[in-house]
Each structure stands twice: as structure tokens, then as C-alpha cells.
Amino acid sequence: MSRIPALRRQPGPPHSLEKMTDLVAVWDVALSDGVHKIEFEHGTTSGKRVVYVDGKEEIRKEWMFKLVGKETFCVGAAKTKATINIDAVSGFAYEYTLEIDGKSLKKYMENRSKTTNTWVLHLDGEDLRVVLEKDTMDVWCNGKKMETAGEFVDDGTETHFSIGSHDCYIKAVSSGKRKEGIIHTLIVDNREIPETS
């Protein structure tokens, strides 16, 4: 009788083939410090639950006999609270939903579009993502909170900062219309950058 050698698992990156067999959901979440990828593994036969944020394992639970429930963790530099809800749909089918700060991902992103402005630009051979948080006037560039200086000008305000050797500012002016409110414009080296929708 011939013997078949046992297969040994080779050490590898966190995204190994073994991981992909139980991968059930992937979400991209845009926060001020960048776009974060959240991946969720749910082994319905093994009871395994694993949450990855940007490829890094945040939660691992084995032998969870209760297949429905929730997993809560933090995302990004601001440690934003995120929860994955696991609900039974029918039989052995499951639905996975992501909540950010207690809101559905869709509702959270709709709300964020009202409270932030985002610009994507290419500068010195690098792709940059600039985010303005309207409530605090904090400015982020590729995940780093920028040092800023505010200045009042005739028609509004300017929030000045630098990206490398480039002078930048975000100009805030009234739209003159109550529903539109304040219009924010990013200027880099005296050139207006279109906002990302």
C-alpha cells in the first residue's frame, strides 16, 4: 500500500489560498486618512470568523458555534468604529452588512459626502488624495493630517498648507444660496483642482 505524503502548509502572505476559501465579503471604506479595505471570512462549517483591515488581521475567532452575530473593530487613524453584522437569510445562506459609526455603510458614505470634500490629484509623480473635514476644517493628504493656517480674505476664508514644495490652500466662499451653503475649492500652485465626486 503506497503512502501519500502529508501536505504541509507553506508560510505565505496573509492573503493565502486557505484564506480565500472562506472570504465572504469585501468593502472599501473611504475615511479622511484614506480608503481602507475590509475583508471578512466566515467559515460556516468551521465556525471561523476573521476580519482583515488593509490586509492586517484584526479579529480571529475559531469554533464559533453561533453562526450569526456581529464583530466590532476599529478602522483608520481616527479609530472609527466598524461592525460586521452576520444574519441568516434562509437555510444556510447568510447576509453580511457593514456599519460604520453605527450607520449602514451607504448611509455613512452619504453623510460623509455632506461633511467632507475630497480631491484626487497627481503631483511630483505621486497620486494624492486630499480630504477636507468641513466640521473641523482638518485637512488630510494620503493619510496624514496636515499642518494648516487659516486666513480670512475678502470673500471668505483660506486654509493654507503645503504638499512637498507646493503651496496649497482650500478657499471657502458662500454660494449665496441657502441649500448649497459654502463652496470649498482646492488650489495648488495657483491652479484649481476639480473635486472628486
Regions found by a protein language model. Name each.
Residues 2-197:
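Cysteine-centric segments in proteins
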